[in-house]
């Protein structure tokens, strides 16, 4: 769809994976699980329903793989209460999630070996970036309940391929 060279994608994914610390939960295995779940959601309903265009779909995949990039291992409440550098930098607003976005984008823009969007139209790059930012910021647990409700509302109107898919989605969200 975007003709991104395979080697560039492999380079990018390898570098993103290296940016995941060995935390008990927010680690590369968790990122791969979220990426896989995003793939299942996209290909078992969202594309068929016309909910996603290509740029947004790419944004979903990138947000999934980057959503906990360089995670500190501490939750936002702890970072804010302890006045951590991340909390100070991001003015106590979703410090982890803002850091994940900023860190991942800093990485992606740092080398032509993994800067895949350089050949995209400016408008598409802006749409992609906005989607990634919105999706990663939505992973803040303070926003999770509202996001889950919204997701359930959208997915409940989607025509899923079978009852098992609907049960899986309802169990996850």
Segments the model singles out, each with a brief description of its role:
Residues 1-95:
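Acidic/His-rich, divalent-metal-binding segments that scaffold phosphate/diphosphate chemistry
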Residues 56-173:
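Divalent metal-dependent catalytic cores for phosphoryl transfer on phosphate-bearing substrates
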């Amino acid at each position: 769809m975007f003709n991104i060279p395979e080697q560039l994608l492999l380079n990018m994914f390898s570098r993103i994976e290296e940016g995941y610390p060995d935390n008990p939960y927010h680690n590369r295995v968790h990122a791969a699980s979220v990426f896989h779940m995003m793939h299942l959601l996209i290909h078992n309903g969202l594309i068929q329903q016309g909910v996603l265009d290509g740029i947004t779909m790419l944004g979903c995949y990138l947000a999934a793989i980057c959503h906990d990039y360089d995670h500190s291992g501490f939750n936002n409440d702890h970072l804010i209460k302890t006045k951590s550098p991340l909390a100070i930098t991001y003015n106590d607003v979703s410090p982890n999630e803002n850091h994940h976005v900023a860190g991942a984008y800093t990485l992606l823009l740092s080398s032509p070996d993994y800067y895949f969007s350089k050949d995209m139209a400016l408008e598409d790059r802006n749409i992609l970036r906005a989607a990634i930012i919105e999706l990663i910021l939505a992973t803040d647990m303070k926003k999770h309940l509202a996001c889950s409700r919204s997701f359930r509302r959208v997915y409940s109107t989607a025509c899923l391929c079978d009852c098992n898919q609907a049960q899986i989605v309802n169990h996850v969200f």
